[in-house]
Curated annotation (Swiss-Prot):
This is Low affinity tryptophan permease. Induction: By tryptophan. Is subject to catabolic repression. One of its GO terms (cellular component) is plasma membrane. It comes from Proteus vulgaris. NCBIfam families: araaP. The gene is tnaB. It is a multi-pass membrane protein. Pfam families: Trp_Tyr_perm (PF03222). Belongs to the amino acid/polyamine transporter 2 family. Mtr/TnaB/TyrP permease subfamily.
Amino acid sequence: MENTSVNKEPSIIVGGFVLGGAMIGAGMFSLPTIMSGAWFINSLFILFIVCFFMFHSGIYILECISKYGAGTNYFDISKELLPKWACYIANASLIFVLYILIYAYISAAGSIIYEASLLYGINFNLRAIFFIFTIALGATIWWGGACASRLTSIFLFIKIVLFILAFSGLFFKAKGDLLFSATFAGKSQLYLYPFIFIIIPYAITSFGYHGNVCSLYKLYNQNERKVVKSCIIGCLLALVIYLLWMIGTMGNLPREQFITIIQKGGNLDAFIDSLYTVLNSKYIEGFLLWFSISAVFCSFLGVAIGLFDYILASLKFKDNKTGRLKSGVLCFTPPLLLCLFFPNGFLIAIAYAGTAACVWAIICPAVMALKARQKFPNSGFKVWGGKKLIYAVIAFGVVGIICQSWRNLIYCLFIVK
C-alpha cells in the first residue's frame, strides 16, 4: 500500500501527464469520425474554444476546494456552495460521466485488445478481456494513488512515442486537398456548418480532466500554483496531440470513408481498420495498434482515479486496504457489468458523457465560484477574468447541452437516409 506519511510533491510534469492521460486517450478516436462533417478548419476552431472554456471551468473547481482544504471533494463543495437540488443534479451528472466514461474505455479496450489478439493469432473471449482489463488496472488504483499516477505517466510516455512512430508517415503523406476541402458529396460549405454543433459534446469530453482536480490538490499538498501549471500542461499537451491526430487522419482518409465508420457503429476497431487501408507497413500497423491500447489504458486510469477518490471521500471510507477495496468494488462493478451486457457503446457513451459534463464540469463550477467569492471575498486563490468570464463559461455550458439535442437532429437529417 501507499505510504501516506510521505508528503513529497511530484513534479508539475507528473500532474500534467496525469491530466493528459485523462484527456488524451480512447476518446480521441471519436474526434476525426465526428469531425468528418465540419472537417479540419472548422473543427480546429471549435477545439481551441472548447479547450479555453474547459481549462477555466476546471480551475474554478480548484478555486472552490481551496477554500475548504485538502481532502475536500466535489461533493463537499457542491453541498456548501449550491442549493440542495442543484447539488444533487451536479453530483448525479458527475457520477454519470465518470461511470459512463469508464464503461466506454472498458468497451474500447476490449475491442482493441481483441483486435490485437487476432493479429497475433490468438482468439480471446471478449468478455474475459473486459474482466481481466478492469481487475488488472483497478488493482493499481486500489494499491495507491501515487502508483496509479506514475503508471499513467508511463503509459502516456509510451503512447506519445508510439504516436510519433505510427503517425510520422501519415503526417508526411497528408494531402492538403483533403484537409482543406470545402465541399462534401457535392454540397457547399454552408451545408456543412450545422455539423460544427455535433463536435462540441465530443470535444468537451476530450478535454475532461475535472474529476482529477481534487486528487491533484491533495497530491500537491494544497499548492494551487502547481495544480494550475499542471492543468495548463495537460490542456496544451492534449490540444497539440489532437491537432497532430487530425492532420494524420483527415489528411489521409477521404470524408466518405468516415460515413462507413459511422455505419459500423463508430467503434474503435472500425476506425483502426480504416486506417490500416492507408498504411503500407506492418511495423506501423503494429505501432498503431499498441498506441491505441496505451491510449485506452491512459484514459481508463485517469478517469478511474477521479471516481475512485470521489467514492472514497464521499462515503467516508477509510484510506486503508479495506476501505479502498470497498471503493474499488463500487467504482468498477457497474461499468464492467454494463460492458458485459452492452459491449459496443463507445461512440454513444462519449457523446452523452459530454452532455452531462456540461452540467457538473462547466456550469456548476462557474456558479460555485460565484458563490465562493461572495462567501470568502478576501481569501486565497481566485481565478482571473472576473464575473464576465464566469458568465461566459456558464453560457458555453448551456450551448453544449443544446448541441447534444442538435446532434441527434442533424444526424437524422444529414447522416441517416
